[in-house]
């Protein structure tokens, strides 16, 4: 049964409801209220399901049409800003994860290729419509931009300026996605690029996009790389590495970077070190992911590099995600035959929940520039 067929129901006056109502009221959210961030319950078992199953129950019950919210992004932002997780009754703290407080906080899995097949191979029909022409599935830079395309191009330009690219350089792009950055670097800075991805769909599109340029796209694990590059860049890939592999990751970068080279890391980050796994994101979105913390990045990079610059523009990811959501909704009539209504609700939940988390400053977006100690230092672009 679709969610549109399920009418709002009278909420049961039991302990499940009372606990949920008390918690949500602390965030200024009403049950069956009329404000944009209020939730409308369509199944009386909703409260029990969420309190018993936590984040997974919250997300799956939305996918099943058990509850609605006009502005999911506002709902998550309010819940996270209120710090509800820290206000839970003691005996619920291990199981209750209302609002998915760490939506990207996922542990790494041994089989790194899973994420390529589960998420990035969903289909280019979806991503090509939702993303900008450069197919950037990472945070845009909105400082002087007023639309997604210009904001993503501003991000690409800033990356290249931070890397201080010069004609003839060899550049390694770890986690190259659909080849947008590789294409931009090769066509605008006359550099040779090697891109690495674990998604067959991404490799195919990246090769087509970069045809005629000095760009090679490899379908392989980054740990197998053994070459020499003037510059290395990694955008939106470190989230899939996992804490147990952070030391290996920086060792691989060190092994492949020339002595005078520069490395730029672009990653979502956690405001504190936490290895907990969010079961909903782990099951439906990124089966191989975990957000790094400042401490983890510093510890793993310290044996190899000098940290030249740390740039946080996480607030821009909120704007980016809402732009993606707007384009996703606009494109849905064109792609609906390829996906289920439940998939639409899943992706709606994912984009809005993440936007709310960035808006609440619960998660961050960092660009970190490393060298081995460039003489006279680096003047890093903004």
Curated annotation (Swiss-Prot):
An annotated GO cellular component: extrinsic component of cytoplasmic side of plasma membrane
Q: Does the keyword Lipid metabolism apply?
A: yes
Specify the domain of life of the species encoding this protein.
Bacteria
Q: What is its main location?
A: cytoplasm
Entry keyword set: Cytoplasm, Lipid biosynthesis, Lipid metabolism, Methyltransferase, S-adenosyl-L-methionine, Transferase
Which Gene3D superfamilies does the entry mention? Vaccinia Virus protein VP39
Task: State the Pfam families in the record.
Answer: CMAS
* Reactions it catalyzes: a 1-acyl-2-(9Z)-enoyl-sn-glycero-3-phospholipid + S-adenosyl-L-methionine = a 1-acyl-2-(9-cyclopronane)-acyl-sn-glycero-3-phospholipid + S-adenosyl-L-homocysteine + H(+)
> Where is S-adenosyl-L-methionine annotated to bind?
137-138, 171-179, 197-202
Compartments where located:
Cytoplasm
> What does the activity regulation annotation say?
Inhibited by sinefungin, A9145C and S-adenosyl-L-homocysteine.
Q: In which pathway does it act?
A: Lipid metabolism; fatty acid biosynthesis
Q: Which GO terms describe its molecular function?
A: bicarbonate binding; cyclopropane-fatty-acyl-phospholipid synthase activity; protein homodimerization activity
The broad enzyme category this protein falls into is transferase
What this chain does, per the entry, is described as: Transfers a methylene group from S-adenosyl-L-methionine to the cis double bond of an unsaturated fatty acid chain resulting in the replacement of the double bond with a methylene bridge.
| Domain topic, free-text comment | Each of the subunit of the dimer contains a smaller N-domain that associates tightly with a larger catalytic C-domain.
- What is this protein's name? Cyclopropane-fatty-acyl-phospholipid synthase
Species name: Escherichia coli (strain K12)
């Amino acid at each position: 049964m679709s969610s549109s067929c399920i009418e709002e129901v009278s909420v049961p006056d039991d302990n499940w409801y009372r606990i949920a109502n008390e918690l949500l009221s602390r965030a200024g959210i009403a049950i069956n209220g009329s404000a944009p961030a209020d939730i409308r319950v369509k199944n009386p078992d909703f409260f029990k399901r969420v309190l018993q199953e936590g984040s997974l129950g919250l997300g799956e019950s939305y996918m099943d049409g058990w509850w609605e919210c006009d502005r999911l992004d506002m709902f998550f932002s309010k819940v996270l800003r209120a710090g509800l997780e820290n206000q839970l009754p003691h005996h619920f703290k291990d199981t209750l994860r209302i609002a998915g407080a760490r939506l990207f906080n996922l542990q790494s899995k041994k089989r790194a290729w899973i994420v390529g097949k589960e998420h990035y191979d969903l289909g280019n029909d979806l991503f090509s419509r939702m993303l900008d022409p450069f197919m950037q599935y990472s945070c845009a830079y909105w400082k002087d931009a007023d639309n997604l395309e210009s904001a993503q191009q501003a991000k690409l330009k800033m990356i290249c300026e931070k890397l201080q690219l010069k004609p003839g350089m060899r550049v390694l792009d770890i986690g190259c996605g659909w080849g947008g950055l590789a294409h931009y670097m090769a066509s605008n800075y006359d550099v040779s690029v090697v891109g690495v991805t674990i998604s067959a769909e991404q490799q195919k599109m990246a090769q087509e996009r970069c045809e005629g340029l000095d760009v090679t796209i490899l379908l392989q694990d980054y740990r197998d790389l053994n070459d020499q590059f003037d510059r290395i860049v990694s955008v939106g890939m470190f989230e899939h590495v996992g804490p147990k592999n952070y030391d290996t990751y920086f060792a691989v970068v060190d092994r492949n970077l020339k002595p005078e080279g520069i490395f730029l890391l672009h990653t979502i980050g956690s405001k504190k070190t936490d290895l907990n796994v969010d079961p909903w994101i782990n099951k439906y979105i990124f089966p191989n992911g975990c957000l790094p913390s400042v401490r983890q990045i510093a510890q793993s990079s310290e044996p190899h590099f000098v940290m030249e610059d740390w740039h946080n523009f996480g607030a821009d990811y909120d704007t980016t995600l809402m732009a993606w959501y707007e384009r996703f909704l606009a494109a849905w009539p064109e792609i609906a035959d390829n996906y289920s209504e439940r998939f639409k609700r899943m992706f709606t939940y994912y984009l809005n929940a993440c936007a709310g988390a960035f808006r609440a400053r619960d998660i961050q977006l960092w660009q970190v520039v490393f060298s081995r100690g460039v003489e006279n230092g680096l003047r890093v672009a903004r």
